[in-house]
């Protein structure tokens, strides 16, 4: 997929880029797979802001995605490649031989008319989903389960892929996009290929209005707030933050402070951390 620029009719338009969406084949989603979404504005049931910078944005319908791929040994034909406003990857509408329709995450190279299959006996072909036990070492995969039958949880965003590094007994070693190598049980399923929309990471949003359409509100610097609103706030004019290191709005150290629990149960499944050389 290509990225297009714009004539500099305004200063923000000069830097702005956008995907050309060449792979998209239809603009009308499948009605039976849509669910209404209610906006929260980042507020909880008490009306208090629990997540900042959320609000507004274009109306969306949620597309029900099949992350389990549990309809085994029944071929499904790709009918369309569609845009999904709820994720960075494109989605594919597939119709099974028995007539059932489902959405799946579209991998790179999947085209209208292609056939995808799930199940242990599936071929090693882009878009097919099978247990890691049946995938050859070295294969590039995405949509990886952490618990068998729960549905894919890892490597689902645009342009991402993982690689199967080794298999030994009940566990496999998978290198994730971050560089982390992790144990994953061989019964867990994964899909062959790389997630679509690879150019997403080089798109320049360019202007605030596009972020507002996405439902993202402005981020105010702590140094321009009052001292009762942020640890960096207060002072006369442009004052120092008044701390040895930057702080979050709630007073905890920011920028590099480790927030992961040091005795997390999943530590035993991490073979190599993403920062290790």
From Swiss-Prot:
Gene3D superfamilies: 2.30.30.30, Nucleic acid-binding proteins, Ribosomal protein L2, domain 3. One of its GO terms (biological process) is cytoplasmic translation. SMART domains: Ribosomal_L2, Ribosomal_L2_C. InterPro entries: NA-bd_OB-fold (IPR012340), Rib_uL2_dom2 (IPR014722), Ribosomal_uL2 (IPR002171), Ribosomal_uL2_bac/org-type (IPR005880), Ribosomal_uL2_C (IPR022669), Ribosomal_uL2_CS (IPR022671), Ribosomal_uL2_dom3 (IPR014726), Ribosomal_uL2_RNA-bd_dom (IPR022666). One of its GO terms (molecular function) is structural constituent of ribosome. Residues 219-277 are annotated as: Disordered. GO terms for cellular component: large ribosomal subunit. The keyword Ribonucleoprotein applies. Keywords: Ribonucleoprotein, Ribosomal protein, RNA-binding, rRNA-binding. It holds the Pfam family Ribosomal_L2_C. The keyword Chloroplast does not apply. Part of the 50S ribosomal subunit. Forms a bridge to the 30S subunit in the 70S ribosome. Belongs to the universal ribosomal protein uL2 family. One of the primary rRNA binding proteins. Required for association of the 30S and 50S subunits to form the 70S ribosome, for tRNA binding and peptide bond formation. It has been suggested to have peptidyltransferase activity; this is somewhat controversial. Makes several contacts with the 16S rRNA in the 70S ribosome. This is Large ribosomal subunit protein uL2. The gene is rplB.
């Amino acid at each position: 997929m290509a990225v297009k620029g714009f004539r500099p009719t305004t200063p923000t338009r000069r830097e702005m880029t956008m995907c050309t969406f060449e792979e998209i084949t239809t603009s009308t989603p499948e009605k039976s797979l849509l669910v209404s979404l209610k906006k929260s504005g980042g507020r909880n049931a008490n009306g208090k802001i629990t997540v900042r910078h959320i609000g507004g944005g274009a109306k969306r319908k949620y597309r029900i995605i099949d992350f389990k791929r549990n309809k085994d040994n029944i071929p499904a034909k790709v009918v369309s490649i569609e845009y999904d406003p709820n994720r960075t990857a494109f989605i594919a509408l597939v119709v099974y031989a028995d007539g059932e329709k489902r959405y799946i995450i579209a991998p790179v190279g999947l085209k209208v008319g292609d056939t995808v299959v799930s199940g242990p006996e599936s071929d090693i072909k882009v878009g097919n989903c099978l247990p890691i036990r049946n995938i050859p070492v070295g294969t590039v995969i995405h949509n990886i389960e952490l618990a068998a039958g729960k549905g894919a949880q890892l490597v689902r965003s645009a342009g991402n892929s993982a690689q199967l590094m080794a298999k030994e007994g009940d566990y496999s070693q998978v290198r994730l996009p971050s560089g982390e190598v992790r144990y994953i049980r061989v019964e867990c399923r994964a899909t062959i290929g790389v997630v679509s929309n690879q150019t997403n990471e080089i798109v320049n949003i360019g202007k605030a209005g596009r972020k507002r359409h996405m439902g993202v509100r402005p981020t105010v610097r702590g140094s321009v707030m009052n001292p009762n609103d942020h640890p960096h706030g207060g002072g006369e004019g442009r004052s120092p933050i008044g701390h040895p290191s930057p702080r979050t709005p709630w007073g905890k150290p920011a920028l590099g402070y480790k927030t992961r629990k040091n005795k997390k149960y999943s530590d035993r499944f991490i073979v190599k951390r993403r920062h290790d050389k």
